[in-house]
């Protein structure tokens, strides 16, 4: 099946997401990345990842591809939930180094393989995996629509997709609180903890520019996925997207 690569539909101004810049940024914050996630989300990032993994209903036979695997939280969680084999892909070498340490500590090295690679050109064969996941990484890809097409290519027919990504809450009560936090508190705390000036200024900018909800569903549909759903979590601060390769 040929997949049409469409341009982003948001019309919002995109921050610089050149692969070299993004990889360098994550290399710089890798040592404190897990701590930052816990601090900035109040520990909710772990809950959201568990929700994504649970949505896949793993049976113990699946081959899982975790793209933008970072420090391998979803890869490890998938293996613990019964995935037979997990391949994690990321283009930040430092993030993968920390992920590998966690895989070894979890004694899952026989079932998890971490590979350096690009989400827009995945180093896996077509129709080779049963499940594909991305947690909080798709918005960092220079061309998210190309990454979605690659996920579709990698999945076998009937394969399942789960993507976690930040959104923009529209609640009249929670929305203003979230916007204030993301614009003022998050960048300041992120800079202090990460010791990196740009990374947590980039975070709210990338969230604000990214397609979410129905707009991202359109990107998944254009890549070929069916049964696409977007489930808002925490009033839409995060979305869980699911789909199937028909």
Please tell me what each predicted stretch does.
Residues 145-160:
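A short glycine-rich, Lys/Arg-flanked "PGG" loop and its adjoining helix->strand segment in the class I
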Residues 63-121:
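Class I SAM-dependent methyltransferase SAM/SAH-binding core
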Residues 223-227, 232-246:
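Core SAM-dependent methyltransferase catalytic element
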Residues 33, 132-133:
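Hydrophobic beta-strand segment of the Class I
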